[in-house]
Amino acid sequence: MGITGMIYIVTMVFSLIVLILSSSTVGYDYFQFTQQYQPAVCNSKPTPCKDPPDKLFTVHGLWPSNLNGPHPENCTNATVNPHRIKNIQAQLKIIWPNVLDRTNHVGFWNKQWIKHGSCGYPAIMNDTHYFQTVINMYITQKQNVSEILSKAKIEPLGIQRPLVHIENAIRNSTNNKKPKFKCQKNSGVTELVEVGLCSDGSLTQFRNCPHPPPGSPYLCPADVKY
């Protein structure tokens, strides 16, 4: 085989490697820091929560997301080693509980890491960095939705209230960036289930959350129960 043939083969192999790598990697534009209101989560499931919910917004997950096209998911099948997060498990159980089954927090964290966190590279380096990042955001950076609303005198009283009041309170703590809401109807009343705070792809500054498409559960009415 001549030099020309060797160059052709090397070029084809290199092109194939690039194609495989690019097809197996989905990038992301921004992050959603999603927090769920425990009582509404329990009301949304056909099987009741095993333990009474706290009247708090706690972490659902930190999700790398795209403005257009599919969001990246399941970028690894490697489960979380509980020993690697042993020193932060006490904090995680408080801010990131498995609301549906408090006997299996690790299972919930593992699902969030595999489905979402593993796709956050380079902003998220590994599983321990993923969980520590969430702790920093929720506690140190005070991206705790319950705390944000409480500072604005909006307490979880289980009453109907204007969604715009909730949005304005959150905007005041996120450099006036638009949050994302998810609602559900329960016994004819629309409950606020989730709030998402959006950040850029490097997790360094807030950004507006994209407007949800028509028919999305992320479209909430003017008044919601909280």
Swiss-Prot record:
Binding annotation for RNA: Q36, H60, N98, V99, F108, K111, Q112, K115, H116
One GO term of the biological process aspect: RNA catabolic process
Keyword list, A-Z: Disulfide bond, Endonuclease, Glycoprotein, Hydrolase, Lyase, Nuclease, Signal
Molecular-function annotations in GO: ribonuclease T2 activity; RNA binding
GO cellular component: extracellular region
Signal peptide: 1-27
Protein EC: 4.6.1.19
Catalytic reaction list: a ribonucleotidyl-ribonucleotide-RNA + H2O = a 3'-end 3'-phospho-ribonucleotide-RNA + a 5'-end dephospho-ribonucleoside-RNA + H(+)
Active site residues of this protein: H60, Q112, H116
Presence of the UniProt keyword Phosphoprotein in the record: no
Cited function: Self-incompatibility (SI) is the inherited ability of a flowering plant to prevent self-fertilization by discriminating between self and non-self pollen during pollination. In many species, self-incompatibility is controlled by the single, multiallelic locus S.
PANTHER family listed in its UniProt record: OS07G0630400 PROTEIN, RIBONUCLEASE T2
Protein name in the entry: Ribonuclease S-7
Organism: Pyrus pyrifolia
